[in-house]
Amino acid sequence: VSIATVDRVLNNRKDVSEATRQKIKDIIKEYNYQPNLYARSLSVKNNLSFAVVIPRTSLETGYWQLCLDGINKGISEFSSFGIFIEVFFFDQEAEQTFHDATERLLSKKFNAVIIAPIFIEETKEFVKECKARNIHTIFINSDIPGHSSMGYIGPDLYSTGKLAGNLTSYLGKEHSKVLILNVAKGLENYKYLNTKIEGYRDYLNELNRAYQLEVKDIPFNNYDEIEPELLRLNYELRPDVVFVTNSRVSIVAKFFHEHQEVSKPHIIGFDFLKSNVDYLSKGCVDFLICQRPDKQGYLALNHLYRYFLLKESTNEFKSMPIDILTKENYAFYEN
């Protein structure tokens, strides 16, 4: 066969008979052929660019810093193949900053963009514009099913909720009062938390233990504003278990640690952040569920690299491992 035919098979192009294609694939497998990635990168250098759109890190939570750490690792690794990667930040409490970031992005040329879809409707519009410009998209952290062209890499939110329910079953007794707590400013933009809560409810309802479940929102980030809300909820509900649906579990733990006059509930929350681990080590938090945010950004870049440089298939759903940390094992854990 000709070199051109082999090239068409290697790059998954058309105009090759199925018999010839299979024969070439068998030879490739037999001789363990690997493409010369550095040579291939020369052909795409100066026109292969990826963008990342994520929230900037905040003082209240270092979650997005972990995600950025993984992205920076990917930038360091994949830039050697001639790939240009640029990160665009927005404030997850201000929709206009997302619009501004994506406008700057669209003023440049990119082959693909990694998106943390905090603002659902705005993200849908942005993805629609990307599609019109032939820019591939992939989501991290949370998903909007059916909208990204290259899939989703992040936690299975429903399963994390079910896991939290499973952990609650070890802490709560029949008829226990359970407070499901959403803590964040701009909670209307955290729709994905509802998926966690759905999984949590479903698991506990299947147990038929008559748990008393209450879902409450505290739409603040500052502890001085959160503290009186927690004080009110505690006296109103007297919870046996508190399930914090995001990474702000340290704020809740701080409240119960400082207010010795109130009865301390069991606490479950998310993410391997220093502030959370501090209270886990003190026994104020019973369980942390970790979703490896640092891996999400890195794997998304790796996915784009494999698609554009290795010519591998796309449309991937990559669910992150779900890790459980306790006071006894956190010291051995690495994100």
Which ranges hold each PLM region?
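N-terminal helix-turn-helix DNA-binding module of bacterial transcription factors
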Residues: 1-46
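Amphipathic helical "hinge" segments at domain boundaries
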Residues: 36-96
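Hydrophobic alpha-helical
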Residues: 112-131, 216-275
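Hinge/beta->alpha junction and helix N-cap segments in small-molecule ligand-binding domains
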Residues: 56-63, 87-97, 154-162, 182-205, ...
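Hinge/cleft segment of the Venus flytrap/periplasmic-binding protein
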Residues: 27, 31, 188-189, 204, ...
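Short helix-capping segments at alpha-helix termini
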Residues: 77-81, 133, 204-211, 258-263
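Flexible loop/hinge segments that line or gate small-molecule binding clefts
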Residues: 122-159, 273-281
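Hydrophobic alpha-helical segments within soluble ligand-binding/sensing domains
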Residues: 152-178, 226-227, 292-309
